[in-house]
Amino acid sequence: MASREIWSLAGTFSTWVKGFFILLILSVCASSLQAKEYAAEQQRLDKFFPGASLSAAEGDYQVRTITKGDEVLGYAFQSIRVTDMPAYSGKPINMQILLDPEGVIVDAYMLEHHEPIVLIGIPEQKVHDFNANYSGIHVDQRVVVGRSSDKSAVTVDAVTGATVTVMVINEIVMRAAHTVAVDLGLVEAGATARPKPALVREDVFQPTSWTELVGNGAIRRMHLTRGQVDDAFKGTEAEGVDVAAAEQRDETFIDLYATHLNPPTIGRNLLGERQYADLMANLKPGEHAFAVLANGEYSFKGSGYVRGGIFDRVQLRQFGDTISFRDLDFIRLSDVYAEGMPEFFEMAIFTAREQYRFDPGSPWNLELLVRRQVGPVESIFTSFEMPYVMPEEYIERVPLTAEELAAIEEANRPLWVNIWYQKSFQVGVILVALALLTVILFLQDKFTQHPNFLKRLRHGYLVFTVVFIGWYALGQLSVVNVLTFVHALVQDFRWELFLTDPVIFILWVFTAASILLWGRGVFCGWLCPFGALQELINEAARKLKIPQYDLPFSVHERLWAIKYIVLLVLFGISLESMMMAEKAAEIEPFKTAITLKFDRQWWFVAYAVFLLVINIFTRKVYCRYVCPLGAGLAITGRFRLFDWLKRRKECGNPCQICANECEVQAIHPDGHINHNECHYCLDCQMTYHNENKCPPLIAKNKRARRDKKAPAAPQLIPVQVVEP
């Protein structure tokens, strides 16, 4: 009768959990179906430019001009047209950016995102409030989220719980705004933070031959054969177009030389005194002249500049910026005076104007573009780059202060590197904590022989996991991380996506390593903040003598399946829509209890509190039966290499002490440990080494003491025969 009631209770509990999960999925997914009657982008335009007209989208970046009558008021565009930088979710955030004609940001508004913490968690209004900081910022200014060593930078506060998301938004807004402003001619091209341009030493001149200039790197050469050019088009639609015959592959396609003419030792030796003086007189401050000379069948000038005014076959690149040349930047070069110079079929001088902020002391590349026609109006381009570095004796570098050097280094670092620098304290503390945990795990046999010390150490570690890893560093791993990783593997995997959150990245690396060595238990028992919170609450309940309830093992074993079903459902939803899967992943209370510290809508808080209340009476109910992350880790845990949890042949038959004491019921009645369920608390190992508690060990010690007291060899008792 009792058994039947238990099975009925288990069935009811299982049905309730599944029903609750389905209800939660439906409720959170339904919130994404709200229709928008009025486009948000038009609302923002009406707010900042009331009564203005909007042109059709134009150019590579689909920029729309905002006008009122004949007056241009500004420009509107979407960041997705400029950069597709992935955010924390692995997908880009789309921002509508409004600029005024002076290159000042009027508005930056988030149109679309897939960020889990913002979809359900942090109110979206907090992100909109963050974006309001960009109003009034010039596109050439540097904006930093958090601290910065650059005193000239504009610093803005992050959104708690969404630091990575807003740092990506900052990168997207400033990069897109600057790129479009340059394209529109509102600001000068160039990076917003770079070294101070070096100065050309006009006092340094030495008569030098062509051979010497080539030898010291002042003149650079790029020789391309027809075969090399054909090979560059392999794998494109232009493969096989205009290819050279086998005997023609070694023929010269172009033999190209380039140099910077401003240094007197180069310019005067090549152009002669008068031609060099005329050239320098026509250059404005900050402008630089370059000579390009070539032989071969390919013309670096082409004929495009005649029709469109732009040279489409040759350009310079420095600091990631492209320096294009127009017909007004071109001077015909016919007379060259350098001793030993070969004859050239084609020669030209190009001028980089002051707006490009060219630095003669920094490396640059001459880029040669080669085009092949693949259709009536379609062409395929490939490029060949020739690097150039100015010899040091021709320039003078302007020394930078320590602050300027630090600011330049910070500005030129990738986004994920800056995030690691900003979170260096959290990273350092967590690395030390993981090192301590590694020592505990490798020396577990020593630690478990001192149970009182190990229990205090473990409880302290769990407090650290909840307070520091969870609530401070926001290092709560989630099944969403797993789904994102799986989708990244089959789509567009980029390491920087996972490196943007250093705490999560480090914890995942350690968790992956620990799974291979010991199974899922190390993370679930030591590093999961919500799991640690449950365990500490349950420990307090036991101290208060609150009754504890455990299901019969046969029922408990069958309820394990729920978490695997939850994982499969989430994975199936993610195949259809990752956004829906992120909403459905609210079956995890992690975001509520850890990331947002219970600061969200009451129904989410009620769900998390409900799980913690159940945990008072039965330890880690959520972890045992519902957690999809634990299910995913358990599946990968089957690849573990070692089994360091020791057992005796008497474990399970007849001894049941460890099985009865295991707080998560991970030990089967027959004595073996189920590593899919074990949380690696090491309680069973403390019992294993406890000479006053482990029955087989007690019996073994009794035998040893008895054997020690027994004589080593039988002693003969002397007998004296007495005659009668």
Curated annotation (Swiss-Prot):
To P.denitrificans NirI. One of its GO terms (cellular component) is plasma membrane. The keyword Membrane applies. InterPro entries: 4Fe4S_Fe-S-bd, FMN-bd, NosR, NosR_regulator. It comes from Stutzerimonas stutzeri. This is Regulatory protein NosR. It is a peripheral membrane protein. The gene is nosR. Its main location: membrane. GO terms for molecular function: DNA binding; FMN binding. Residues 215-234 bind DNA. It is found in: Cell membrane. Transmembrane segments: none annotated. Keywords: Activator, Cell membrane, DNA-binding, Membrane, Transcription, Transcription regulation. SUPFAM superfamilies: 4Fe-4S ferredoxins. Transcriptional activator of the nitrous-oxide reductase gene NosZ. GO terms for biological process: positive regulation of DNA-templated transcription. The keyword Transcription applies.
